[in-house]
C-alpha cells in the first residue's frame, strides 16, 4: 500500500507511473492487516499529525474509490478495572485528546454506539477519529482507478534487481525502466537489492504477527474494538497510569509471551478480523500456534457476551518497522534519483497516504 499510494500521488499530480510488483498482485502486509485507519494510539506530534492527515486522505480517496470500503466507524476499548480506566482517563486529559476524538463512556453509552458489546465491562474509551477500509481488496480498487487515468502501468510478477543509472532500474525480465524518480517501497523485503543499496545497517527490522478471520457475526459490529492490552503497545497511552497498569495488572501469560493485544474489525461480509501477536526475534517461526487464537477468542467472547463464529482463516504476516519506533518511516536516497521508503511498522495501512504525500512534496512532484 505504501508503493501504491506513491503511485496515487504521482498520477494525481499529472505524472506517468510504472508500478512494478514482485507478486502478480500485492499479497504481503498490505493485505494481511486489520484495515484500520488507527489514529487513537499514535504518539503525539509528527506521528499523530501524519495519521490525521492520512485519515483525511483516505476519506477523500474513498469518495473517488468507494470500493475501498472506507467507513468512519471509530473505536471502542472496553474497560474492566480501575487501572485500565485510569489509563483511559489520562488519555482523555491529553492536550491532543480532542484531535483524536477521545471520550470516556459508561458501559451503557458504549453499548448505545455498539450494541454488539453485550459482555462484561464497566466503561469504554471511545476514539471517534478511527476508521477502517477493506485490506484484502483496497489495493485492487486503487489499481482500477489508477489504470483508468491512462497514465499508469502495472507490471506484476516482476522484481527490480538492479539500479543501472540515474532513476533507472532493471527488472528480472531484463527490461529497463527509467523515469524522473524511482521509489523502492519494498515492505518487509529488506535483503537483496535493498541491502546492496542501503547497506547492512539499515535501521529497520522485521516483525511477524498472527491474525484470524471468522465467519459472519450475524449482526453489525459498528466500531472497531480493542482491549486494554492495546494501551501497553501504543505510545499515546504512556505515562504514570500505564506504569501502574503494567506493575499492578500484568498481562495474561499467553498475551505476555506473544506480546499480544486485541484489535477487531468487522469486514463487509460480516466476518471479524481479529489479532494480533508480535514476534521480533529472528529467525521467525514458520508455524501459526494455537494458544494466541485461544486467548483472543476468550477475550472477544467476553466482550460480545456470546460465542465467536467459526474461525475461517488463520494467517501470519511480516511488516517492516524502524528500529527507532518513534520514526514514522525510513526514507533514504540510495542512488541518484532512487529513494527507499520502508519501515512504517504497524502504522503502514493507516499512514501510507500521508507518507507518500510527504515523499511527493519533498521530491517536488
Question: What are these regions, as identified by a protein language model?
Answer:
Residues 11-31:
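Glycine-rich FAD pyrophosphate-binding loop
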Residues 34-113:
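Dinucleotide-binding Rossmann-like beta1-alpha1 core, especially the glycine-rich loop
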